[in-house]
Regions:
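Extended hydrophobic
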Residues: 164-219
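Hydrophobic/basic alpha-helical segments enriched in Actinobacteria
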Residues: 15-21, 26, 92, 110-115, ...
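Amphipathic alpha-helical regulatory segments at dimerization interfaces
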Residues: 27, 38, 77-88, 139, ...
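Amphipathic alpha-helical effector-binding/dimerization core
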Residues: 54-152
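N-terminal helix-turn-helix
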Residues: 1-76
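Short loop/turn microsegments at loop-to-beta-strand junctions
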Residues: 52, 93, 124, 170-171, ...
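Short helix-to-loop capping/linker segments positioned immediately adjacent to catalytic or ligand/cofactor-binding
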Residues: 84-85, 93-94, 155-161, 177-184
Length: 219
């Protein structure tokens, strides 16, 4: 029950912020009765709302992410580093991890400026379009990377997004050799990202520190 309830929550995203009972049932391969049961339970708990036809998530869902951020060791350990880096470069900095097809941002220190990139904790970006995502992909063992490439479609978000898997392989090899990643215009035109790895004692990347700026704002 808990697993399926979480799957229901994850079925809602930026492309489908609202779903009907039938649409959810089809998406998760549920009966309409089961879909309704999960939806009504989540509504009763305050995690979902409905207009009688469509359903959508409420802000209460953010508490789940806040609970993770409050309890997870990695964000708490790295936040002082992000603060120092932001103070030094005058730009917002972020902490990201790799989850399935996405780079997930789990920590941020904002620069004291009016205009800044809108990457908040909980933001997910396709890993192949993100400096942090590419950096983390480059540190995957070869077999794991090949499995990732096999199962993950490389969608185009701008005219410059790399969607060819052989091209991405070459880019990732370059990133691994140089130890950092720079992207520009891969997910959003004018957005430039620079990422470096957080390595554990075995040399594996457990996260990435990212600075992202709008190119037109750089002096």
């Amino acid at each position: 029950g808990l697993r399926k309830g979480l799957e229901v929550i994850c079925a809602f995203d930026d492309t489908t912020p609202k779903l009907t009972q039938s649409e959810l049932a089809q998406r998760l391969d549920l009966s309409r009765a089961a879909a309704r049961r999960y939806l009504m339970t989540l509504c009763a708990l305050g995690y979902m709302a409905s207009d009688g036809k469509a359903f959508w998530l409420t802000p209460k869902v953010m508490r789940l992410g806040h609970s993770y951020l409050a309890s997870a060791r990695l964000p708490r350990t790295v936040m002082p580093v992000l603060q120092t880096l932001t103070n030094t470069i005058g730009e917002s900095t972020n902490l990201a991890v790799l989850e399935d097809a996405d780079a997930v941002y789990i920590g941020r220190v904002s620069a004291p400026k009016l205009l800044s990139t809108l990457i908040e904790p909980g933001t997910r970006l396709p890993a192949h379009t993100s400096a942090a995502g590419r950096l983390l992909l480059s540190y995957l063992p070869t077999d794991d990377l090949e499995r990732w490439l096999t199962r993950t479609p490389l969608g185009a978000y701008t005219p410059f997004t790399v969607t060819d898997k052989d091209t991405l392989r070459r880019e990732l090899t370059k990133v691994r050799k140089q130890g950092f990643c720079v992207t520009e215009g891969q997910y959003e035109l004018g957005l430039r990202g620079v990422a470096v790895p957080l390595l554990d004692s075995t040399g594996s990347a457990v996260g990435a520190i990212l600075g992202a700026v709008l190119v037109g704002l750089i002096d």
